[in-house]
Amino acid sequence: YRPEEMLVICPSESGLTRGPVEIVKQARSLGIPCVCTVQSGGSPLERYCDVVIVKPSGKELALPSTKGYSVGLLVLLLCLLEGARVKGSVGQAEYGQINQSLASLGGSCQSIAGQTVKWFLRRQYPVMKPPFYRIIGYGANYGTAVEGALKMMESHKRMTAAYELEEFLH
């Protein structure tokens, strides 16, 4: 691929993490355009990106970034959808249908959040009792297990480890 055929996308909360900043610097030195999402303006990551999208999710009150992460994914999904529309990969009817589905997400998320809280309150003791947790993933979902373990540790401060299924069975 040529640089004009590539794009580096860096979803970020603070824009301070060294890895994404270094990746964007390297990409820019190769002439590859860069886009980032950040929680608020003025970060080092923004200085090296061609496009900066400030996420409208507001400040996170809890340590695990759930709201900002979800909004960042939605923003990137909208960017990809718009790119597909402009490129002609998505027809007008499909584009409208996807936008309509995305517009209903807010209400769905509130409903699911309420159901999740009720579920947790009914199971709070058995969920919080163990001193540690193991999250097991398989194949492409191993990354999901790793991210899930991180979010669990951030949320309840108990040791949580992620394992790949076949490795765990040894």
Residue spans for each PLM region:
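Glycine-rich phosphate-binding loops that contact phosphosugars or nucleotide phosphates
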Residues: 1-96, 101, 138
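Anionic-ligand anchoring segments at beta-strand to alpha-helix junctions in alpha/beta enzyme folds, i.e.
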Residues: 1-8, 30, 128-170
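Structural signal for conserved beta-strand scaffold positions within catalytic alpha/beta enzyme cores
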Residues: 10, 53-54, 111, 162-164
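A generic local structural motif
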Residues: 21-22, 39-40, 119-122, 168-170
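A ubiquitous structural signal for well-ordered alpha-helices
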Residues: 23, 105-108, 148
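Short, structured loop/turn "capping" segments at alpha-beta junctions
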Residues: 88-92, 116-120, 159
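Long, charged amphipathic helices and adjacent flexible linkers at domain junctions
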Residues: 98-117
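A short, well-structured juxtamembrane/interface segment
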Residues: 113-129
